[in-house]
C-alpha cells in the first residue's frame, strides 16, 4: 500500500518539497508493530524510482523503519492496556517520521544534489522535507490514529 500510494502520487511524493501521503501509514505501528517491516519494504520499493537513487532506497527506507519502530514504542502501553494512546504519545508517533525523514532525507538530498554546499542544502532540504512530513502526519496521520481502533474493532478502555 505504501509503495502503491507513493508511486501513484509520484508528482508530490519525491524531492525536497514532498507531500508523501503514504507517510500517514507510519502511524500503523502504534497499534500493529509488525507493520514497521511492511512500511520499510514499501518505502524501499517506492524509492527505487527516486531521483536520489540507491541512497534513497537504503537510507530513506531505514528512516521509515526507524520512524515505525518509534511509533510502535509510542503505542506499547496502549496495546498492553487496550486504551487509546495518550495525546502526547499520539503527537510523538506523528513527530517521529517528521524528525527521521527531515534529518535522513535532508542529508540524502543534500549529498545527492548539492554536495558542494552540503550543510546549507541539508538544512534547507531537511526543513522542507520535515514540513511536508508534518503536514501529512498531522493532517492525515493523527486522525488515522483515532480511526484505526474503530476500523479494526480494537478493544478500547477509557484512558485515565
Predicted regions and their residues:
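Hydrophobic transmembrane alpha-helices
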Residues: 1-37
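Small-polar-interrupted transmembrane alpha-helices in polytopic inner-membrane proteins
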Residues: 2, 39-47
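Membrane-embedded alpha-helical hairpins and interfacial helices in multi-pass inner-membrane proteins
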Residues: 10-16, 24, 45-62, 66, ...
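A generic, lipid-embedded transmembrane alpha helix
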Residues: 31-42, 101-106
Amino acid at each position: 500500500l505504501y509503495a502503491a500510494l507513493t508511486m501513484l502520487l509520484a508528482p508530490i511524493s519525491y524531492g525536497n518539497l514532498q507531500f508523501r501521503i503514504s507517510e500517514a501509514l507510519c502511524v500503523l505501528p502504534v497499534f500493529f508493530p509488525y507493520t514497521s517491516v511492511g512500511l520499510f519494504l514499501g518505502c524501499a520499493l517506492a524509492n527505487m524510482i527516486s531521483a536520489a537513487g540507491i541512497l534513497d532506497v537504503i537510507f530513506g527506507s531505514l528512516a521509515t523503519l526507524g520512524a515505525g519502530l518509534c511509533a510502535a514504542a509510542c503505542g506499547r502501553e496502549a496495546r498492553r492496556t487496550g486504551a487509546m494512546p495518550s495525546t502526547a504519545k499520539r503527537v510523538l508517533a506523528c513527530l517521529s517520521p517528521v524528525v527521521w525523514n527531515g534529518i535522513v532525507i535532508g542529508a540524502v538530498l543534500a549529498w545527492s544534489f548539492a554536495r558542494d554546499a552540503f550543510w546549507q542544502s541539508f538544512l534547507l532540504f531537511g526543513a522542507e522535507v520535515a514540513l511536508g512530513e508534518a503536514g501529512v502526519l498531522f493532517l492525515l496521520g493523527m486522525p488515522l490514529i483515532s480511526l484505526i481502533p474503530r476500523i479494526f474493532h480494537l478493544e478500547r478502555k477509557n484512558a485515565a
